[in-house]
A protein has these predicted regions:
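Short beta->alpha connector loops at strand-helix junctions that form conserved
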Residues: 74-75, 115, 141-142, 164, ...
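Glycine/small-residue-rich loop that forms an oxyanion/phosphate-binding "nest" at active or ligand-binding sites
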Residues: 63, 68-96
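RNA substrate-binding interface of SAM-dependent RNA methyltransferases
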Residues: 46, 98-99, 103-190
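Structured adenosyl-cofactor binding patch, chiefly the S-adenosyl-L-methionine
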Residues: 93, 132-133, 147-160, 217-253
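Short acidic-hydrophobic, aromatic-tinged amphipathic segments that line or gate anion-handling sites
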Residues: 4-8, 72-75, 163-173
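Boundary-proximal intrinsically disordered activation/regulatory segments immediately upstream
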Residues: 1-60, 144-145
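Active-site regions of enzymes building and remodeling cell-envelope glycoconjugates
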Residues: 66-76, 109, 202-205, 224
Length: 253
């Protein structure tokens, strides 16, 4: 396996990696996204993700890579200068963006909708949990964190390489759910709210809102009913990722 050595921070590849880390529009334009860590690289290779380039710190054991992957070695100092993480894990790699196309109809039974969930760690953790509980799909609407942000990808722990997720407009989502006969429920309080454990989730999409604002009015207007997670009156709300975990577990069991 041929491994290049790069020493300059101004090298075009290093500049490319920094842009992938910081710019959603650049990721879309270049057709690649950036991931961090040897464990995540192992997951990418295991699940056949289209890895393009892999960069390793000096001293890190380089795994067997497909012949199509460009392998590069850099100093630890150079790795710190390009890594989007405060504590680099010894490897950065780029993956081709998937050509995700919305299906004509939804064949599954359990879906999760994220409405303005803007923290990358929360979005990544939710996708990881959706994978664990065999959710049939996750939809991101209204300025959610980018699924392909390096921090989001890292938090998925590999689920990004095997679980379907779609960034859609509210109108696209509502039309698809209606066409597929999948009712939309939301985690919010209003006159028709029922406890989550009492809801019929045998076929449903459940929307989770941001911690600051909850569900958007547009989303609430489309919800057939709203659901609440019973909790101590001392607590006003749950972290979005925790709320999603409870919902996903109820749909799974």
């Amino acid at each position: 396996m041929n491994v290049e050595t790069i020493t300059s921070r101004q090298n075009p590849l290093m500049t490319h990696l920094r842009k992938l880390a910081s710019s959603r529009s650049y990721r879309k334009k270049s057709g690649e996204y950036l991931c961090d860590g040897t464990k995540l690289l192992d997951e990418a290779l295991k699940w056949g993700a289209p890895v393009q380039t892999a960069v390793f710190s000096d001293g890190v054991e380089i795994p067997t890579l497909p012949d199509t992957v460009r392998a590069v070695c850099v100093s630890e100092d150079l790795m710190r200068s390009v890594s989007p993480m405060e504590t680099p894990q010894g490897a950065l790699f780029t993956v081709a963006l998937p050509e995700t196309k919305l299906p004509e109809t939804l064949a599954g039974k359990h879906y999760l909708v994220l409405d303005s969930v803007q923290d990358p760690g929360n979005v990544g953790t939710i996708l990881r949990t959706a994978d664990a509980f065999e959710c049939d799909g996750v939809f991101l609407v209204n300025a959610c964190a980018d699924l392909f942000n390096p921090k989001t990808a890292r938090a998925t722990m590999g689920a990004i390489f095997r679980r379907e997720a779609y960034s859609v407009t509210p109108e696209e989502l509502f039309a698809l759910l209606s066409k597929s006969g999948v009712p939309l429920y939301g985690t919010a309080l209003r006159e028709d709210t029922v406890p989550l454990s009492d809801a019929n989730l045998s076929k449903a999409a459940v929307a989770i809102g941001s911690e600051r604002r909850g569900l958007s009015q547009q989303m609430l207007d489309e919800c057939a009913k709203t659901l609440k997670i019973p909790m101590s009156p001392r607590c006003e709300s749950l972290n979005a990722a925790i709320a999603a975990t409870v919902v996903l577990w109820e749909m799974y069991r």
